[in-house]
UniProtKB/Swiss-Prot annotation:
Disulfide-bond pairs as recorded: none
EC id: 2.6.1.9
Catalysed reactions, as listed in the record: L-histidinol phosphate + 2-oxoglutarate = 3-(imidazol-4-yl)-2-oxopropyl phosphate + L-glutamate
Sites bearing N6-(pyridoxal phosphate)lysine, chain numbering: K221
Organism whose genome encodes this protein: Caldicellulosiruptor saccharolyticus (strain ATCC 43494 / DSM 8903 / Tp8T 6331)
Gene Ontology MF annotations: histidinol-phosphate transaminase activity; pyridoxal phosphate binding
Keywords, comma-separated and alphabetical: Amino-acid biosynthesis, Aminotransferase, Histidine biosynthesis, Pyridoxal phosphate, Transferase
Pathway(s) annotated for this protein in UniProt: Amino-acid biosynthesis; L-histidine biosynthesis; L-histidine from 5-phospho-alpha-D-ribose 1-diphosphate: step 7/9
GO biological process terms held by the UniProt record: L-histidine biosynthetic process
Coiled coil: none
Oligomer and partners: Homodimer.
The family this protein is said to belong to: Belongs to the class-II pyridoxal-phosphate-dependent aminotransferase family. Histidinol-phosphate aminotransferase subfamily.
Protein's name according to its UniProt entry: Histidinol-phosphate aminotransferase
Length: 358
């Protein structure tokens, strides 16, 4: 009954929701540090805009996200026709695979990295070529060695999820320049807004030069709109036109569009989230060093720390204390956990609990 490839695909397993943990374990308080969400949530301006939009829930949304597209295009200094929106950037990865990958084609990605790249490749009957990380980041030299006549897409998560590492400007530019123009290069910048490092490359600046480049970004992370599912891609007008051919109608709901428009105007909230994240990472690094736990310096809003024992067991023990993190076994890092930066009090509770379970 089912396509053979479906047997090879594992469903995505999200971080445990707070309500489920409370119900299963009978806990009154649960701190979720598992899914790289903004602990500040959306800004007050966004909440106000959402409340004012509720009378329109009976109407279909703007299928082209016109107002949002115009506003974002101005902010990014690109044409509106270079942008497409999706129900999270997850959906756009599926659209990308559907316009480029035929059965038997391949796409290249790092391992571990964002798991959807592998999934969407398999769904199209493609072959995922997974290149192990080198020093916890993308090994682009090895990527180049695996490009062949059946390669259709190259996925680069920058910063990488789950390790939080980056490919620096010159290395990424030279790699993209070396890739044949008929192969799509996707640079996923979900955590870009957290970064101030001058060596971090914003690939949007290269779109005029590389017509095969696609840049993914999202409102789920620093903007605090994860539950509304809205992300976007910026690329050449030709690529965006092809993506729109396979995009479902009305794929981004009205409330998500309204929230994103309001979020773009609230730079003060973004700066506040960046500052909190910076302080949280510094606190984690200091705490891990005191505990003599190795960790990977992160450019995102999360950090991978080596707990030096079975991460699943540590995850379970933390769960009993009302702390949700991500065990690293799903990333082929069986002694690591990934922890999202939280509010100051949440971070302190996590470190206290971690000391108790180790």
């Amino acid at each position: 009954m089912f396509r053979e490839v479906i047997r090879t695909i594992s469903p995505y397993i999200p971080g445990k929701p707070i309500s489920e943990v409370k119900r299963e374990l009978g806990l009154e308080k649960v701190i979720k540090l598992a899914s790289n969400e903004n602990p500040l949530g959306p800004s007050e301006n966004v909440k106000k805009a959402i409340k004012e939009s509720l009378d329109d829930l009976s109407l279909y949304p703007d299928g082209n996200c016109t107002e949002l597209k115009l506003k974002l295009a101005k902010k990014l200094n690109v044409k509106p026709t270079q942008i497409i929106f999706g129900a999270g950037s997850d959906e756009i990865t599926q659209l990308i695979a559907s316009i480029f990958i035929n059965p038997g084609d391949n796409s290249i990605m790092a391992r571990p990295s964002f798991p959807r790249y592998e999934t969407v490749t398999k769904v199209m009957g493609g072959i995922p070529i997974e290149i192990p990380l080198k020093n916890y980041t993308h090994d682009l030299e090895e990527f180049s060695k695996h490009i062949n006549e059946r390669t259709r897409v190259i996925w680069i998560c920058n910063p990488n999820n789950p390790t939080g590492t980056i490919v620096k400007k010159d290395e990424l530019y030279n790699f993209i320049k070396s890739v044949p123009s008929e192969i799509a290069v996707v640079v996923d910048q979900a955590y870009k807004e957290y970064i101030d490092d001058p060596e971090y490359p914003d690939a949007i600046h290269w779109l005029d030069e590389f017509k095969n480049l696609i840049v993914l970004q999202t409102f789920s992370k620093i903007y605090g709109l994860a539950s509304l599912r809205i992300g976007y891609a910026i690329a050449s007008e030709e690529i965006i036109e092809k993506l729109n051919r396979v995009r479902p109608p009305f794929n981004v709901n009205h409330v998500a569009q309204i929230a994103a428009i309001a979020a773009l105007d609230d730079q003060e909230h973004i700066e506040k989230a960046k500052e909190l994240n910076k302080k949280s990472l510094e606190f984690f690094y200091k705490s891990f060093e005191e505990m003599k736990l190795p960790y990977i310096k992160s450019y995102g809003n999360f950090v991978m720390v080596d707990v030096t024992k079975d991460a699943v067991e540590v995850f379970k023990k933390l769960l009993l204390k009302g702390i949700i993190v991500r065990p690293g076994d799903i990333f082929d890092m069986p002694t690591y956990i990934r922890v999202t930066t939280g509010l100051e009090s949440d971070n302190m509770e996590f470190i206290k609990a971690l000391k108790e379970v180790l």
